[in-house]
Regions:
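Pre-recognition alpha-helix immediately N-terminal to the DNA-recognition helix
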Residues: 20-22
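Short, Lys/Arg-rich nucleic-acid/phosphate-binding segment
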Residues: 64-70
Length: 116
């Protein structure tokens, strides 16, 4: 049950477009609030609020270096989310296989009608 609660927290955090953009920026490496602000054209309080939500969801961590705070992605929650999504892969594959079988059957019927 903890797994589902954690996944809900992560998905809720990522559902907001600005937070998703921040995660995409951090994918390429650590950034300060100021750097994120410049790249997104948002004001500093907005970015800080979004970073706090991402941090509370466990997606981002802070590294203080000298007088700056660098934000970076935490790999583990993203790995968990990837595993969760992959758990649906068998379902998708089965459905695509059934669809393929159905389409092949339709083609066979169509060919049989033409030959009659």
């Amino acid at each position: 049950m903890v797994y589902i609660i954690n996944m809900n927290t992560i998905l809720n955090a990522l559902a907001e477009p600005n937070r998703l953009q921040i995660v995409e920026l951090l994918r390429d490496g650590s950034l300060t609030v100021g750097e994120i602000t410049d790249k997104l054209g948002m004001n500093q309080p907005q970015v800080s609020k979004h970073l706090r939500v991402l941090s509370e969801a466990g997606l981002v961590e802070v590294q203080p270096i000298a007088n700056r705070r660098y934000y970076k992605l935490k790999a583990e929650p993203l790995k968990e989310m990837n595993e969760w999504v992959q758990s649906f892969q068998k379902l998708w594959e089965d459905r695509f296989d059934r669809l393929d079988d159905y389409l092949q059957e339709l083609q066979r019927k169509k060919k049989n009608k033409r030959s009659e």
